[in-house]
Amino acid sequence: MSNVRSKICGITRLEDALAAVEAGADAIGFVFYAKSPRAVDVRQARAIIAELPPFVTTVGLFVNASRCELNEILEVVPLDLLQFHGDETPADCEGYHRPWIKALRVRPDDDLQAACKHYAGASGILLDAYVPGVPGGTGESFDWSLIPQCLSKPIILAGGLSADNVAEAIRQVRPYAVDVSGGVEQRKGIKDAAKIEAFMRAVRQA
């Protein structure tokens, strides 16, 4: 049985958040990036979070947001963790009085050990597929063999995961956590409770 943590990202509806919690997800993610079909506004996110039970980590995903924009969101939405998915420097990620993770889009020549050292203040590193011009949420997977063993940061594996491949991903990569969005959707922004349950079952059984 796996004790790998899980995050269901791209939540836009309360029923989807509650389905994720019911299935056993450790965290749910809200996308604060207007170009994403899964984007939410502060009122949506705050209303959903207000209905969550305790011990569910709420994560805000940002792509090159200004410090002013991010602070305005944090004044309204009680997020536990920040996820930076753009070209942010370590300095861009600091100073919000919350733990944060940095997403990296993996390419064959990337030095992931060096990236972990570069983002020394991160609580973890999220590894996603590289698709030119798209910061994430593509539904594409990548070659997991590109991930070195024993990276210096907890690894959150993302990119094209679903109930069909997450168990193999866990066996191969041995991540701290897995992150899914498109793999548990009816359509972009709308989750499928049965797919969430199947995904979480596969995670537990890995």
Swiss-Prot record:
State the UniProt keywords alphabetically: Amino-acid biosynthesis, Aromatic amino acid biosynthesis, Isomerase, Tryptophan biosynthesis
Q: Name one GO molecular function term.
A: phosphoribosylanthranilate isomerase activity
Q: Which InterPro entries match?
A: Aldolase_TIM, PRAI_dom, RibuloseP-bd_barrel, TrpF_fam
Membrane spanning stretches: none
* Gene Ontology annotations of biological process type: L-tryptophan biosynthetic process
HAMAP family in alphabetical order: PRAI
- Family note: Belongs to the TrpF family.
Protein name as catalogued: N-(5'-phosphoribosyl)anthranilate isomerase
**Species of the source:** Pseudomonas entomophila (strain L48)
